[in-house]
């Protein structure tokens, strides 16, 4: 009796709203657990399909789509192929038109100036030719061996040309060698005569002439070249020198080279040094005069 009374009293005194541990959804959650399992499987399949679709539209932190390498290549190729499709022809402004006209006028003026320059250069060439025609000419003849070949040259050039100067210098050198060779030959002839006289004397005295005969000398190399027995071989340095002289005459830059050569440069430097020394002397003289004036004022 007492237990039943306590249970009745507890049921009457119990209030669900005052009970903090009471959860009315517990009973329904257990009952609907089996039903919800099937629904969860369907939702998982839908989520997987959504994830697969979303990989093609990945959004970066800044909000734009993140493109794959293939997508970027396709986009660049598309832009390259269709880069001229979006160009719109617009009317040319007056400013651009005026600039274009100015450029055309400038190009025409340049062409006109070039024609004038060509006419002037032709006239200067004619003047040079006329000047050369009135000048004394020199005929240059050369026969030499170069690179195993015998080369023959014959040309007529003005006497003031670089090639003519080089040729005349070579002639002077050859003349000097000729004179040296002739003096050598004379000395050798005198020696031979003296030897003959001594041989005659020794023959009279009974000494064998063959033993006292001097052996014949080989003729000098320069004498062979002068006599024509040997053709002069031209070295690479001499050939380049001749080619340079020919080029100078062809281009007509002999006067320009003589004006800007080493001697001309040294002369200019000497002149500038003299000018500097004169200025320095004048400055020293002015300083001396100023010092004299100041000394007189202090006295």
Curated annotation (Swiss-Prot):
A Gene Ontology BP annotation from the UniProt entry: chromatin remodeling
Main location as per UniProt: nucleus
Region (Disordered): 1-71, 177-213
Keywords: Activator, Chromatin regulator, Nucleus, Transcription, Transcription regulation
Keyword Transcription among UniProt keywords: yes
Superkingdom classification of source: Eukaryota
Keyword Transcription carried by entry: yes
Biased composition (Basic and acidic residues): 1-11, 185-194
Compartments where located: Nucleus
CC terms in the record's Gene Ontology section: cytosol; Swr1 complex
All copies of domain BCNT-C, residue ranges: 216-293
Biased composition annotated in UniProt, kind: Acidic residues: 12-22, 36-48
Disulfide bonds: none
Family from the record: Belongs to the SWC5 family.
Subunit note: Component of the SWR1 chromatin remodeling complex.
Function: Component of the SWR1 complex which mediates the ATP-dependent exchange of histone H2A for the H2A variant HZT1 leading to transcriptional regulation of selected genes by chromatin remodeling. Involved in chromosome stability.
Name of the molecule in the record: SWR1-complex protein 5
Source organism of this protein record: Candida glabrata (strain ATCC 2001 / BCRC 20586 / JCM 3761 / NBRC 0622 / NRRL Y-65 / CBS 138)
Gene: SWC5
């Amino acid at each position: 009796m007492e237990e039943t009374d306590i249970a009745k009293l507890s049921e009457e005194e119990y209030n669900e709203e005052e009970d903090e541990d009471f959860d009315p959804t517990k009973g329904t959650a257990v009952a609907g657990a089996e039903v919800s399992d099937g629904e969860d499987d369907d939702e998982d399949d839908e989520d997987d399909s959504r994830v697969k679709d979303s990989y093609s539209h990945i959004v970066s932190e800044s909000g734009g789509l993140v493109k794959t390498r293939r997508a970027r290549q396709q986009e660049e190729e598309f832009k390259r192929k269709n880069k001229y499709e979006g160009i719109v022809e617009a009317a040319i402004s007056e400013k651009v038109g005026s600039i274009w006209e100015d450029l055309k006028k400038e190009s025409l003026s340049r062409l006109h100036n070039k024609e004038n320059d060509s006419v002037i250069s032709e006239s200067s060439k004619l003047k040079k030719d006329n000047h050369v025609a009135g000048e004394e000419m020199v005929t240059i003849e050369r026969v030499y061996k170069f690179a195993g070949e015998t080369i023959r040259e014959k040309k007529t050039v003005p006497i003031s040309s670089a090639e003519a100067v080089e040729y005349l210098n070579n002639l002077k050198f050859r003349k000097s060698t000729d004179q040296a060779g002739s003096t050598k030959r004379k000395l050798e002839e005198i020696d031979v005569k003296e030897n003959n006289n001594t041989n005659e004397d020794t023959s009279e005295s009974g000494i064998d002439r063959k033993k006292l005969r001097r052996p014949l000398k080989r003729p000098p190399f320069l004498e062979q070249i002068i006599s024509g027995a040997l053709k002069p071989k031209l070295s690479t340095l001499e050939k380049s020198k001749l080619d340079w002289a020919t080029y100078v005459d062809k281009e007509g830059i002999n006067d320009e080279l003589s004006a800007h050569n080493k001697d001309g440069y040294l002369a200019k430097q000497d002149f500038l040094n003299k000018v500097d020394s004169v200025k320095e002397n004048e400055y020293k003289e002015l300083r001396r005069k100023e010092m004299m004036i100041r000394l007189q004022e202090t006295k």
